Amino acid sequence: GGHKPAKVEADLSTGWAVDTIKFALNDALVNWAYSLTKDVEIPASVSVAKFRSQFTDNPNARKPPFVTIGDTLSASTYWHGHHLNHWANDWVKLYSSQQGNFMTSNMEDSGTMTALHRLARINKVDANRVLILRTASNFTVPPPGKTATWSATAEYPDKGRAALEAAYRV
C-alpha cells in the first residue's frame, strides 16, 4: 500500500492499483457523437423544472436538460453529499492527470468497461469503439438547506422518466 495520499497520477504507482480503475474513451469518437447530439432538444416537465430550481447554488443544475461531455465516477455504494462529492472530484482529477471533469456518479459503467476491456485483451471487442451515454435523474449533492440524507432519499421528479426520455432522444 501507499504511505501517503496520492496527489498526482504518478503517485499511484507507489501503492496498490489495478488497470480497471479508470477508462478513457476514444476522444475522436466522443467528439463525433457529441457533434451529432449536442443540439438535441430534451424536454423537461414542470415538476423536473421545479426540482431543479432548488439548486440555487449551482447554475448548471438549474439549466434545462442539455447534452454535454464529462466524466463519471463509478462506486459500489450509492452516495450523496458535499463531502463525498468533493472526494469524487479529487478522485477524477487524480486519475485523469488533472484533466477530468466529474459530472455524474454511477454504479454500472465500471463493470461494463472492465468486461469490455477484458474482452479486448483477447481480441473479441474493440475498446476504442465504446461510447457511454449517461442521463441524470438525480444529483450527488443536495440543494442549499437540505441534507445528504434528504438528497439520497428524495423522490425523483416524474419517477425518473425524464432521464429515460433523454436517453431515447439522444
Identify the residue ranges that each predicted region occupies.
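Accessory terminal and edge-of-domain segments that mediate assembly/interaction
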Residues: G1-V170
